[in-house]
Amino acid sequence: MELGLSLGEAMADAGRELVLGLGMGRREEAAEAGRRDHEVRRELEFGSMSSRCGGSSPEPTVRLTLLPMVPGLGLPWPPPPPPSSESRHLEASTRGFDVNRPPSSGGGGGGGGAEEEQDDVAGAALSSSPNNSAGSFPMDDFSGHGLGGNDAAPGGGGGDRSCSRASDEDDGGSARKKLRLSKEQSAFLEESFKEHSTLNPKQKLALAKQLNLRPRQVEVWFQNRRARTKLKQTEVDCEYLKRCCETLTEENRRLQKELAELRALKTVHPFYMHLPATTLSMCPSCERVASNSAPATASSAATSSTAAPPAAPSSGGIAATSSSAAAAAAPDHRPSSFAALFSSPRGFPLSVAPQAQPPTSS
């Protein structure tokens, strides 16, 4: 029997440890914290009543903190939030009327101050307990940040709105609207921009007054117009540079092709040179010899023609004379260049066959 009881207690303790380790006993911990808070408040109220109703030597109040033996949790779960005043009043109403607690209405103003002081002391006691080591500081900080953030957000938003409102008022309007210009205003602004791309304050004021606009609107229009002009010029420059790059690429490709062809010709015909015929000429010494031999040939031809007999020679004598003259003149004829040498036809003398003489009559 004792063995069964001991086993049952061990099982109960093990189950409790398992529940606490998994963080499933938060509701029981909240209930225990509420009970401890109620007991501490009751003790404080009893002590305050005894101090008010007692004699000259009141008994000192002893604060009792009854802490259950709770093993350390395996997981760092956040502590339960401290019970609020509404939950405490609801718990007291469910438990019933407490005869030891004095009515709050009879205390008056002093009772209300004492109750607030007791609530502060109870909150301090709860925050100083070991189970609530973290206390209500994370929640307070979170709520404080939340409230502060909510309070600061409207303030910050109000500051931003006030700044934007001030800037809008400086611009002359409560809300910013896109500037709509008429055709006449646009044309006049374009002409002014062609004359002056930038305006000084006097020109800006005069132009705004003439067009019935604000100076800020004129300044913004000129800024946008300069930006558009710069963008268009950048696009034009980009297109021009792109065309130049394409032209240079084509030229480079053509030069690379020609270079490859020249290298191929150099490797195939290393000793072959294409030279025109006009580059071939005679050396200076040959030219002098040719120029000196030409007058001598002409004088010898004239001498031979004058020395010939007037009698009509026979056919054999004429052929011999012509052949001898041709033989004498042939060595003296020299071309002026190698091109003439190869281009002129060469005449070869034909041998004259001997004619048979007729038989003589006796």
Curated annotation (Swiss-Prot):
Q: Where is this region: Leucine-zipper?
A: 232-276
**Localization, UniProt:** Nucleus
Q: What residues are annotated to bind DNA?
A: 174-233
Comp. bias (Polar residues): 126-135
GO CC terms: nucleus
What does the record give under GO molecular function?
DNA-binding transcription factor activity, RNA polymerase II-specific; sequence-specific DNA binding
Q: What is this protein called?
A: Homeobox-leucine zipper protein HOX11
Organism this protein belongs to:
Oryza sativa subsp. japonica (Rice)
